[in-house]
Amino acid sequence: RACEAAGAAFRVFGGRLLFEPEAIVTSDGKPYRVFTPFWKACLAAGAPRTPLPQPKRLRFAEAKSDRLEVLKLLPTRPDWAQGLRDTWQPGEARALARLGTFIKDRLANYADNRSRVDIDATSRLSPHLHFGEISPNQIWHAVAHAMSANARAVRGAESYLRELGWREFSYHLLHHFPNMPAEPLRPEFVDLPWRDDQAALAAWQRGETGYPIVDAAMRELWHTGFMPNRARMIVASFLVKHLLIPWQRGADWFLDTLVDADLANNSASWQWVAGCGTDAAPYFRIFNPVLQGTKFDPNGDYVRRW
């Protein structure tokens, strides 16, 4: 409206999602609250638009800028960011290279290995997605092309695209339920008698719970800003269902420490683990940290590393 009043044209070019929230709704115009029918509706809507080619020329206005180091936002000792620099190389070129490596080396076995925490089996594109260094459309079409070119990659590709679907679902939920980061989507969980145990919360944050797989994951998070998705589910279940600490405290910690910290994904995932989301794991489903470690870190390599 402000643009119209000023006589300026205003157009929106969505690029953060595969499908805009207004485009994927039920037959009566309501948001989907269960993932499977939501994803079926997305697939029925057709393939996302093909990414546009890189422009041959861009015109930028000249602007003066200082380097981030000038702001002195981080202490020099200890160098808290060293682990991030050792683990991540930001930028579009690195994102595209990581996508290519994933498709070449890991996509075919993704469905079988994606939950392993002891091997590098996933794309690790989430930070690049979060910061807009690569678009979900680029990933979709690259994976779809690999699926059509290699029959061995079909199962892994379908599994991977489904994970992109969960990202879409999280964004759609946040769009329709903007209080999701703070309030359970199932109102019966509002008055759950959580524990206010600051010592237990601190032990979880520092990786000092005494459970090897939990502690390893929390230490990896602190040093690198990342942990595998399976590890996220394990530590989240431990905080919420073993320590009985509110899921919002865990979500806050993840937002502070994850390099791919994303409000939609983070909120929906924590509500899923806690059992208070729209399409969540049952409240009585508890991840056994010992059995999870045995299954997804069978030789203890992940625990020994961290």
Where are these regions (language model features)?
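Trp/Phe/Arg-rich N-terminal binding region typifying the photolyase-homology
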Residues: 1-47, 219, 265-266
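A generic short-segment signal for beta-strand/edge and adjacent turn/coil regions
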Residues: 2-6, 95-97, 240, 275
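Glycine/tryptophan-enriched, flexible segments
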Residues: 31, 37-184, 296-306
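Short amphipathic alpha-helical surface micro-motifs
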Residues: 14-19, 110-111, 154, 252-253
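Short secondary-structure transition/capping segments
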Residues: 3, 7-11, 33-35, 56-70, ...
